[in-house]
Each structure stands twice: as C-alpha cells, then as structure tokens.
Amino acid sequence: MMMVMMAAGCWFSLPVHSQRISVGKKGLVKVMRTDSTCAQEFVRDEHQSVATRKMAKAAGAAEGVNTLANYLKSDVDLNIPVSKVKQEKTFAVIIANENYQEEVNVEFALNDGMAFREYCIKLLGIPESNLHIRKDATLNNMLAEINWMQNIAKAYGAEARFIFYYAGHGMPDESNGTSYLLPVDGKSNILATGYSMSRLYAELNGLNAACVTVLMDACFSGSKRGEGMLASARGVALKAKAEAPKGNMLVMTAAQGSETAYPYKEKKHGLFTYFLLKKLQESKGKVTYGDLFDYVKTNVAQKSVVVNEKSQTPTIAVSGDLVSTWQGIRLNED
C-alpha cells in the first residue's frame, strides 16, 4: 500500500505495511509500521510543528502585555531593593521613546523606562497609581502627561513632589541651539513637531511643587544614541544652549554641549540610566543628589571612554531656589 502525504508544500508517498493509520488531536498523523524512516521523520516533524504552533499561539496571546521580563536584562534589573517608605505625595511621569517613525531608533530606551519605573515603585515607594509611563510617546501623549501633572498640582498644592524621566532623542534648533525633546512622531528638522525644553521647564515650574526632579537620558546636539546623526540633522554635532530651570527644580542630563548620550550595550541600557540605577541599587535609595550626581558623572565619563571611545559628561542644572540645598536632597525622602 502507498500512502500519499503533503509536507512543506510538497506531496510525497510512503510505503506502509499496515492500514492502521489514525489522525490524533491537533491533526497529528500517526503511521504504524512503515518500511521507511521517512514516516518516523514526518511524525517527528509534525510533533515539532505542533510545539512551534503552541509557542506561537502563546506568544500571540501575550502580545501587547508588557511584563518586566520583556525588557530587563542586566544586573540593575535584578534584586531591586524594596523600601518600606511610601511616598504618597510623589508623582512620576516616565517617557521612553525608542521606536521613531521618521528618525533612527533609540537603542534600549524602553529598557530604561521600564527599569526606572520598577525603581520608582519598589525603591522610592511611589504608588503605581501615582506613576504614568508612556512608551513611544507622540507629542500629544507627552502634552497629556504634563496636563496630568498640572491637575495633580492643583489638587495637592505645594505638598506634591514630581519626577519627570525621559529616555529618547533630543534635538537642537540649528539657528540658536535651543533644545527640544523629540516625540516618536516628530522630525528633527521641523521644530513644531518637538517639545521645547524652555516650554517643559516653564510648565514644570508652574506646578509650584515642593520639588521637581528631571532626569534626561538624551542629548541635544543632533546626534543619535550611539553613532552618527539624526536622519534629518546636519552632519555636525551642535552645542545645545543650556536651559535654566526655575522654581524648585533640579535637572540631570546624560551629556553636555555637543556630546552624544551613548548606550551601554553590554547592560542593555543607556549609559546614564545604567549608572543612575546602579547607585540607587547599591545605596538602597539612601543617597543624596550630590552623591548620586558625583557617582553618575564619574562612572559615565570613565566607562564611555572605555566602551565607546568617546567622551560623555553628565551635567546638572539647579534652579536658584535650590542652589544651597540640592546636594542634600534625596529621591527617596523618608
């Protein structure tokens, strides 16, 4: 007897001594006592195919579900200290822009945002309801988050504390060096599609909060994270004009002037974010802004020269109201 089967789009025949052929669950064909190892191979292949389909189905079911395991892959993503402190009046917005529509992507920005979220919840004691994370945020998404912060400020007044974290592209105005954040739907040669730092600072200052912390894993020279320039930027890095924060605001940025904010590929994070998290992890959050910045600046500068063969120097800008006190302030206030 000859049995005809189809596999991988091709028909073939197998000699079979027995007519005991059955179709089991999942359409698996069982062939009993054949003269050829082809039949055994066919059954084995079908087993593998069924297993593959099961895996694909499971992956499809999980699509769109953002779990920590999907993003976090380095030592700072494991063993995150858990604090007993609960900061009920601290609110955080995290923007993680990795996948751009018109520009090159920002490697590991989603890892950065997801990891910082975990530190906010576990180590800083910020309730999940007090934290918004936007992955691949458009300009409207970013404006919506600022509006949310403004509404919080109206309800809580001067008792509220805010953290604004951003990982993604920055861009300069080539005519005057003014800095912009670049949403994923923006283009670096169309300023109207960006979100200016001067506007951001003005709106954050308008919160009239007890303290506003801004953390930027971005550069504003027109360079992309890694090598090269933004697709629509000039072929030279520009020196971005430093914006001055006002009110009770502290701004820590990944790089200065015409420098680039680099990735730390081994750790699957931005270099700046990795060492920011590393210090928080090692200190269990018991670290002042002064010590935190010194650690981040030193380690980023040293590691960048080694792994990227380029300079990267984190900077800090402090509003006039915090000049004399910022070094003693902590993210984890207890």
Regions found by a protein language model. Give the residues of each.
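Cysteine endopeptidase catalytic domains of the caspase/legumain-like
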Residues: 18-334
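Bacterial Sec-dependent N-terminal signal peptides
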Residues: 1-20
